[in-house]
Amino acid sequence: MEYNTSELCDLFADSVDVVDPIFASFGGRYSFGGEITTVKCFEDRGLIDRVLAQPGAGKVLLIDGGGSSRRALFDASSAQVAIDNDWEGVVIYGSVREVDSLAELDIGVLAVAAIPVNAECESVGEVDLPVNFGGVTFLPEDHLYADSTGVILSPEPLDLD
């Protein structure tokens, strides 16, 4: 499904939060949304890969990587795992790599930066906890909507009918 965050902000101004404009789009899908699952980790991607291996239909993985631009938490192989498990998209408060390959894949990917250095893979981190960045607190099961204009967050799914 395609989303227009500008229109959603007009329609649901009192019930959405707008995330600060800190992200660039790296995936081949520019509009995506769904219920979020959160991961908090720092320069370690092992837990991310484990979560993406689970069914993700209608979900967006939201990663708080501390905003690090020293190591990439997500790449084309992670994106393929996400696609294979039906995730709608991934939002990373951190970095990605293999950006040319990511751009060819049908998944939404937003991140702060790109760097060629891979993160560790020791599965250090936490899943399904509140995280805060971009001027917003993200709670597990909140609903995120993203497009080329921005990212918005709602505690409930928005009635788009």
UniProtKB/Swiss-Prot annotation:
GO terms for cellular component: cytoplasm. Homotrimer. Binds to both RNA-binding sites in the C-terminal region of Rne and to RhlB. It comes from the Bacteria. It is found in: Cytoplasm. Belongs to the RraA family. This is Regulator of ribonuclease activity A. One of its GO terms (biological process) is regulation of RNA metabolic process. One of its GO terms (molecular function) is enzyme binding. The gene is rraA. Globally modulates RNA abundance by binding to RNase E (Rne) and regulating its endonucleolytic activity. Can modulate Rne action in a substrate-dependent manner by altering the composition of the degradosome. Modulates RNA-binding and helicase activities of the degradosome. InterPro entries: RraA, RraA/RraA-like, RraA/RraA-like_sf, RraA_gpbac. NCBIfam families: NOT-MenG (TIGR01935), PRK09372.1 (NF006875), RraA_entero (TIGR02998). Keywords: Cytoplasm.
